[in-house]
C-alpha cells in the first residue's frame, strides 16, 4: 500500500525516531536532512535569578526551562522543514547544542526526512 499522497499530514511527533528505521514501516525514499535551529540568549534578569539558585545548589530551573523551550522550538522547526520536503517520517533524529557567545546558545534538531509505507499486518 502506497500512502505517499498523505505524507504531509501524516508527519506527527509519533513518526519521529532516534532509530534508523520506523517500527512497522519500510523506508521507501530518503529525502535528505531536515533540521530546525534556534538561537537563544539569557536575559539579565534570568541570569541573576539562576545565579541565586546556584547558591542553594540543585536543579537550576530557569535554565532548565530555557533549554526545554529551545529544544521544543528546534524540534517543531525540524518537523516543518521535513514537511516541506514531503516527508511522512523522520529517522535518526538528534539534538546538538553549542555556545556561540557569552550567554548565547544554538540548539539544532536534525534527522533524515523519509517517506515510509506501513508494513502489511502492522
Swiss-Prot record:
Short name of any one Pfam family annotated for the protein: YbjQ_1
Top-rank taxon, per record: Bacteria
InterPro entries noted in UniProt: UPF0145_dom_sf, UPF0145_YbjQ-like
HAMAP family attached to this UniProt entry: UPF0145
Family as reported in the entry's similarity comment: Belongs to the UPF0145 family.
Protein's name according to its UniProt entry: UPF0145 protein BamMC406_5002
Source species of the chain: Burkholderia ambifaria (strain MC40-6)
Amino acid at each position: 500500500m502506497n500512502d505517499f499522497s498523505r505524507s504531509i499530514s501524516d508527519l506527527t511527533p509519533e513518526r519521529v525516531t532516534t532509530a534508523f528505521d520506523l517500527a512497522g514501516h519500510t523506508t521507501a525514499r530518503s529525502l535528505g536532512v531536515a533540521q530546525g535551529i534556534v538561537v537563544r540568549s539569557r536575559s539579565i534578569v534570568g541570569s541573576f535569578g539562576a545565579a541565586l539558585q546556584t547558591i542553594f545548589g540543585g536543579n537550576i530551573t530557569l535554565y532548565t526551562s530555557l533549554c526545554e523551550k529551545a529544544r521544543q522550538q528546534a524540534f517543531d522547526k525540524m518537523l516543518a522543514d521535513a514537511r516541506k520536503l514531503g516527508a511522512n517520517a523522520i529517522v535518526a533524529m538528534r539534538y546538538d547544542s553549542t555556545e556561540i557567545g557569552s550567554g548565547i546558545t544554538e540548539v539544532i534538531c536534525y534527522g533524515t526526512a523519509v517517506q515510509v509505507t506501513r508494513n502489511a499486518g502492522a
